Amino acid sequence: MVLQQATKVRLWGNATPNSSLKVRSSWDNTEYTAQVNDQGRWEIWVQTPSASFEKQQLTLKNGQDKIVLHDLLIGEVWFGSGQSNMEMPLRGFWHCPIEGGNHAIATSGKYKNSIRYATIQRVGALEPKDYPVGGEWKVCDPRNAPEFGATAYF
């Protein structure tokens, strides 16, 4: 995961209704507290430091439940959005290779500690959603890079 540097970032989720949730950041060891509403929803704003390739973590506690988000980077978050031009992966499509794609994939490991990539699931809805749809952050390496969007990568 990557959090935008030098700003307040919004974290949110679900927890035990009418309880409190604590979030602790590894970069400054600050503990933040959020009140969980009667529907089990919470949100909190956390101050982030300047960009760094040093891996960070966030610890979330709600009663006996504890979640630790590891391998977190603080830096610039870029969004690549569009249609097929943004969807084409570094590996290319069948009979549609990406110029320089194979070399980029083979050498992508050099960015393992500095680039993270997430593809957000495509989901349609007729009404606005309360929460964004899922996705998973991937480390930049030859195993994951073939699926990275080529336009966003280059």
What name fits each language-model region?
Residues 1-154:
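Cell-envelope and extracellular/periplasmic
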